[in-house]
Regions:
Chain A
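N-terminal cofactor/phosphate-binding cores enriched in small/glycine residues
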Residues: 8-68, 77-82
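Catalytic alpha/large subunits of respiratory electron-transfer oxidoreductases
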Residues: 95, 212-345
Length: 345, 528
């Protein structure tokens, strides 16, 4: 173990840890844009700079390894000034339409500007003028808002493996895009939307959530994806009894925040107008609405009316364990083992 | 799965056979690609050039329905080249000699004749797999949905045991379960021969334990499987069918047969969230709550039990399945009084040794637990068979190659195989009603090769009629290099082009799984 001091507090960490990790262990906050513990380090955004005693320049804490006896300051005047200049530069060509931006309230650029009191840019930069990319049904790409942190690109290459997007060009003309500036539909993109979850600003917006609520109005419920047997953790964001957004759950031990298109964008069947909302009974050849009592009485009568061996049931690989358990308990209690589900199918 | 999903990225070699993982289990697919980037050898075996094949060190494109021959060929090479794990075979297994004798004739040359895979590639695959520090096999329906599915699974086990690749981190045999809770449905005894935790219903101990707890006597004789239930209806033996959240009218092989049964059964109850093709045939339809509208647990493919939490209320008068079942039980005088899913789970844990140590409280605190978890202190089991197999020794079973039940002939010259795609799921009940996915992939496109397209004078987007001995469908075609000449691929997501009108309901004699993966068809241009 290596021992160092951050803002006057002592901390011990593994020798291969970075200053950022040591600070995290102490609960000391350091802002970042381009850092993610699951991705390769690039040290590009310079938001995480800190002062280390005995070193002349500020260092990027995300990719500077700790040394024994190191003395670190994360909140000095110098550090703040550097971060402010950074934000200032980013704001120089960032649209300030926070009023209608879906990311408002959950945007790291907004949060850090608030924290360091940066309200507008002192630099007069050229504005970017990219057309909105909204041809796919899953999410909108507004590259005018992109701060080029590269999280989406690394997520696509290192987590998904699709490798659909790159940072094209250099300098002011840098832009995240699929090859040949093609729309994502014509690229290897599989619309997992993990880039959307990774983006710290409002450059990538899921279409299903637009206008459905501010992040701070939403309640989060952690649950499990209803599709395949991988069992990825999902975070459902709820407002007024409606799921308005879905993200991968980073705390889930199976999926660690990863998802595919079905889990991410495929659960709004919940609010389909075709959902069944009342029991139906066949009368004169037609299915007609009925009360629960009438339907359940009829089913109970029919279940009672046959010998156990004349009864069979298909249980569900979609339903919960508890429901499958009760289904087989019910049928077995009625004297039949004729129970199966589509495991074989 | 004998391993955990989290172990995939550290494997030395991955053998993926009959699984289009990046489309059917995408997040597991990400992990396989991660493993490959970290240096694992990736071997993909499939009749189609699936997406994962593009990332593979070695892609073996075998003829559909020839898995056992290929697996036997790999074992043959491993034994012949001295790559077998002799210590593992000696200490942990039995029946090696018989199995070794059976694979003797499966030389790479002979296997090439059957499978169409070059003998050299078979040798290379065997070496990559057997020489890795830890090697894991993954398969899905491409292995099981055959009339010889049970043999395929046994051959996979033989391969893993001969190379000592079981019972270790990142090494094992991993069937990837299709639906979110298919593992749980099996664990819960939604099967004709076992109650929870695979306790045989006809065993005396099971009988007395459940009788004491439930207060009713369990029927002793094992019941009918899904395919037998359909036949039972047609024979007149089964009069009432209760379907909870399944859609056999689209998912079952030889659909016409199933539709006939659903029409014939005296009373059909269907409990579901949509008016599915099956529900439309019902006498009573009960509206159910969907996953985000109730509490409970799912068990994933790595045996991990996880909490499912309610986020919103069910629409209208729809109710959770467990509520409906309890209502029925009380009308039938069974006197259930569960206060909620947690109480049901406590009963499951009480009656099921592999779930005994699991509770909602632990799931909440520990983020899921993998069975077997026999007591409250047990941390769960990330990989199975660590020190010994469930039954003591691992048993080798000799397996012979058996051709598919139906092969292409002069009248039906093409081979049809079925599966899923990335965007849709199963019978499409949920994904087709998603506002984004539905319109993005609105229709089925049957895949055929360039060669066959040219021969038949068909172009991309043309409407064709595909027929088998059992039925016909009209569908548009996609001309692609994914399928080899002679093979047609369709998914079963779309009722407008219900591929199961064509498939063969010939089942594996043991597992009773129909042969979805191979049947003979012909294809001709259709008038719209
Ligand atoms: S949606 Fe997924 S595949 Fe597509 S660009 Fe984003 S991360 Fe890559
Ligand atoms: S789109 Fe978002 S995640 Fe991607 S580089 Fe731009 S700001 Fe970063
Ligand atoms: S998010 Fe995708 S991979 Fe994960 S469980 Fe759902 S369907 Fe499967």
């Amino acid at each position: 173990m290596v021992s160092l001091t951050i803002n006057g507090q002592k901390v011990e960490v593994e020798p291969e840890a970075t200053i950022l990790q040591a600070a995290e262990k102490l609960g000391v906050f350091i802002p970042t844009f381009c850092y993610s513990p699951q991705l390769t380090l690039v040290g590009a955004c310079r938001m995480c700079v800190v002062e280390v005693e005995g070193m002349r320049a500020l260092v990027a804490s995300c990719c500077t390894p700790v040394r024994d006896g190191m003395v670190v300051h994360t909140d000095t005047e110098r550090v703040h000034t550097a971060r402010k200049i950074n934000l200032n530069l980013l704001l120089a060509n960032h649209p300030l339409d926070c009023l209608t931006c879906e990311k408002n309230g959950n945007c790291r650029l907004q949060d850090y500007c608030y924290l360091y009191g940066v309200s507008e840019s002192d630099f007069k930069g050229d504005r970017k003028d990219y057309a909105l990319e909204d041809t796919n049904p899953f999410f909108i790409r507004d590259m005018n808002k992109c701060i080029l942190c590269g999280l989406c690109v690394r997520t696509c290459h290192e987590i998904n493996g699709a490798g659909a997007i790159e940072i094209m060009n250099r300098g002011f003309d840098s832009k995240v895009s699929a090859a040949f500036y093609d729309p994502l539909e014509n690229s290897p993109c599989v619309f997992c939307g993990m880039c959307v979850d990774a983006c710290p600003v409002g450059a990538l917006t899921p279409k299903q959530s637009i206008g459905k609520g501010r992040s701070y109005e939403l309640e989060t419920v952690k649950t499990v994806c209803p599709y395949c047997g991988t069992g990825c953790g999902l975070e459902l964001y709820v407002k007024n009894n409606e799921v308005v957004r879905v993200k991968g759950d980073p705390s889930n031990p199976v999926s660690r925040g990863q998802v595919c298109v079905k889990g991410h964008f495929g659960t709004d069947f919940l609010k389909s107008p075709e959902r069944l909302t009342t029991p139906l009974i066949r009368k004169n050849g037609e299915l007609v609405e009925s009360s629960w009592d009438e339907a359940l009485d009829l089913v109970a009568e029919k279940l009672k009316g046959v010998k156990g061996t004349e009864l069979a049931g298909f249980s569900s690989a979609r339903a919960t364990n508890e429901e499958n358990y009760l289904f087989q308990k019910l049928l077995r209690s009625l004297g039949t083992n004729n129970i199966d589900h589509c495991a074989r199918l | 799965m004998t391993n955990s999903i989290g172990e995939i990225e550290d494997a030395g070699a991955l053998l993926v056979i009959g699984s289009n993982t990046t489309e059917t289990h995408p997040v597991i697919g990400y992990r396989m690609k991660m493993a490959k980037r970290k240096g694992a050898a990736l071997i993909v075996v499939d009749p189609r050039r699936v997406d994962l094949a593009e990332h593979a060190d070695l892609f073996l494109q075998l003829r559909p329905g020839t898995n056992e021959a290929l697996l036997n060929g790999l074992i043959h090479v491993i034994i012949e080249e001295g790559l077998a794990d002799e210590e593992f075979v000696r200490e942990r297994t039995e029946g090696f000699a018989e199995m070794a004798a059976a694979v003797k004739k499966y030389t790479p040359g002979y296997v090439e004749e059957i499978t169409g895979v070059a003998a050299d590639d078979i040798r290379r695959a065997a070496r990559l797999y057997a020489k890795a520090e830890s090697a894991a096999i993954f398969y899905t329906m491409g292995i099981t949905q055959h009339s010889s599915g049970t043999n395929n699974v046994l051959a996979v086990a033989n391969l893993a045991m001969v190379s000592g690749n079981v019972g270790k981190r990142s090494a094992g045999v991993n069937p990837l379960r299709g639906q979110n809770n298919v593992q749980g449905a099996c664990d819960m005894g939604a099967l004709p021969n076992v109650v929870t935790g695979y306790q045989r219903v006809d065993h005396r101990d099971t009988q007395s334990k459940f009788k004491k707890d439930w207060g009713v006597k369990l029927p002793v004789a094992p019941g009918l499987t899904a395919t037998e239930i359909i036949d039972g209806i047609l024979d007149g033996g089964i009069k009432v069918l209760y379907v909870m959240g399944e859609n056999p009218a689209l998912s079952d092989a030889n659909l016409n047969h199933v539709l006939e049964a659903l029409a014939k059964v005296e009373f059909l109850v269907v409990q579901d969230i949509f008016l599915t093709e099956t529900a439309a045939q019902a006498d009573v339809v009960l509206p159910a709550a969907a996953f985000a509208e109730k509490h409970g647990t799912f068990t994933n493919t790595e045996r991990r039990v996880q909490l499912v939490r309610q986020a919103v209320n069910p629409p209208g008068e729809a109710r959770a399945d467990w509520v409906i079942l309890q209502e029925l039980a009380s009308r039938l005088g069974l006197g259930w009084s569960y206060g909620g899913p947690e109480e049901v789970f406590q009963e499951i844990a009480r009656l099921t040794p592999s779930y005994a140590g699991i509770s909602y409280k632990r799931l909440e605190e520990e983020g899921g637990l993998q069975w077997p978890c026999p007591d409250a202190e047990h941390p769960g089991t990330p990989y199975l068979h660590a020190n010994q197999f469930a039954g003591g020794k691992g048993h080798f079973t000799p397996v012979e190659y058996q051709p598919p039940a139906e092969e292409p002939d002069a009248e039906y010259p093409l081979l049809l195989t079925t599966g899923r795609n990335l965007f849709h799921y199963h019978t499409g009940t949920m994904t087709r009603r998603s506002s984004a996915i539905g319109p993005f992939k609105p229709e089925e496109m049957a895949q055929i090769s360039k060669e066959d397209a040219e021969k038949l004078g068909i172009e991309e987007g043309d409407l064709v009629k595909i027929s088998s001995r059992r039925g016909e469908v009209k569908v548009k075609v996609q001309v692609t290099e994914i399928v080899p000449p002679g093979v047609v691929f369709m998914t079963f997501h779309f009722h407008e082009a219900a591929v199961n009108l064509l498939t063969n309901s010939k089942v594996d004699p043991v597992a009773k799984i129909p042969e979805y993966k191979v049947c003979a068809v012909k294809l001709e241009k259709a008038v719209p």
